[in-house]
Amino acid sequence: MHWAAAVAIFFIVVTKFLQYTNKYHEKWISKFAPGNELSKKYLAKVKERHELKEFNNSISAQDNYAKWTKNNRKLDSLDKEINNLKDEIQSENKAFQAHLHKLRLLALTVPFFVFKIMYGKTPVYKLSSSTSTLFPTFVSGVWSQGWLYVLLHPLRTISQKWHIMEGKFGASKFDDMALQSVSLGIWVWALMNVINGVEFIVKQLFLTPKMEAPASVETQEEKALDAVDDAIILD
């Protein structure tokens, strides 16, 4: 396997792993986010409030009015603390998620994009001369040079006909040897389409819940016919 293809597969595997495990990210983030200590404090306050509420419900407000009132004031104070802690946790988790998104962008998305731009025309798969001749030159050109060939092919035709900039778009730029290969950009594009196709099939066959048939709704005409039938029977 060509080294460029191996690097591309690495980026794709990491990207797909993050995509498939997306529903677990929030749980993972909660373990490493700065708000973890706040979460412990939040849970402790919730537990304290629950115990105090149960104790207050177990005593008589008339017989222990002073204590019951004091506990009620403390419950109000705990409610405010719990709400403030909840807001702080959500704020810190959002900030942490934003940092992770930037990290993913800088460490994965941008490097993969730059890699495809720099090495997009690198041949990663060689075609035999007999195989390459089975397809039109235009198709082989797209395989070897990428989608840019769609724009360059007309320019190449014009340059050959009018002898304009032959060094840029002529035969020397797209020789027969160069057209007998598949470039990294097209190879990655084809691989991603295959993966997406398999994902779609698996999702439709195994992961999509079955929809029940809609209940039949009696139309106005059917109701009218039923009414006529009933009238005939009564007569």
Curated annotation (Swiss-Prot):
Keywords: Coiled coil, Endoplasmic reticulum, ER-Golgi transport, Golgi apparatus, Membrane, Mitochondrion, Transmembrane, Transmembrane helix, Transport. It is found in: Endoplasmic reticulum membrane; Golgi apparatus membrane; Mitochondrion membrane. GO terms for biological process: establishment of protein localization to endoplasmic reticulum membrane; mitophagy; protein insertion into ER membrane; retrograde vesicle-mediated transport, Golgi to endoplasmic reticulum; tail-anchored membrane protein insertion into ER membrane. Signal peptide: none annotated. Present with 2250 molecules/cell in log phase SD medium. Residues 22-104, 199-235 are cytoplasmic. The chain crosses the membrane at residues 2-21, 105-125, 182-198. InterPro entries: Get1, Get1_fungi, Helix_hairpin_bin_sf. Residues 68-104 form a coiled coil. The keyword Repeat does not apply. Belongs to the WRB/GET1 family. It is a multi-pass membrane protein. GO terms for cellular component: endoplasmic reticulum; endoplasmic reticulum membrane; GET complex; Golgi membrane; mitochondrial membrane; mitochondrion. This is Golgi to ER traffic protein 1. Residues 1, 126-181 are lumenal. It holds the Pfam family CHD5.
